[in-house]
């Protein structure tokens, strides 16, 4: 067993030497059970959580030194890793309590309201009790979660030097885990693009799908769009979607000397275009990186931070539109609630969002409107 772990470490060192460019991708075509009801959703969710947990426990046997070496992180945050692990365990236990009773016995039997140790025991059934038509999905899922868990642990391990969405810094921050079961919010960063670009196409697709979300605008790109098309045209193009700020420039604000200027300038441009009467004006820090000083400054201006817990990774050239939708679907089943991060400056969200909506159309998930954020 020890030799297997050491091989895993060496392989992971190679894979993670390039950091976040290694992205967990799933293949939903390998899931051979129906997705036509709330029960079907819960059966799939249960199995995703069990495979995640099985992989989580495999990685958890690494000691701190081995883990940080695997992640390629020096002087990592022990507390950040411990916090993420504890929160993850608690979230999984809570998620199992939300499963329909008749889904508990399907495929892999799990007792009602299981404890974390009982869930660990249930994962031992996966290799022997899964039907033949789910074996390929199982192998793909294990590979997905191995990479995904390391994605999360890497963020947690680096949280002492670089903050991110992996942990909240203040009770007022929202990341999606505070939402109700099977409730999801769509969010889109970095726009707007120029006229008839990806932003415009995505807005039209959202309207066709009867969906909306929050667009976090970059002040510099908004200025360019206003200069090209006029303030009134920009103000009307987003329809029922809400607007948030992504600051003036897309740079990490955690150590940026003029972060206050960047925030204020972007806010001024956005508020000159959009009406925020009875609407919360959210802020999303670039890369999710912020400091307590930034949080306090924003709160004084009644501008809470909105993070995310489901990252589509749609910005990467290494992941296709189909892989984006499969990744998001898988994480929606795993976490059972959340804020989903897309980017409207790239084309993949316009393909992935309709595919995700179609996949879950019979499962009674709730697409949150911005004013329904918990």
Located regions from the model:
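Exposed alpha-helical structural elements
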Residues: 48, 144, 232-233, 323, ...
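Charged/polar, solvent-exposed surface patches and flexible loops
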Residues: 51, 83, 90, 94, ...
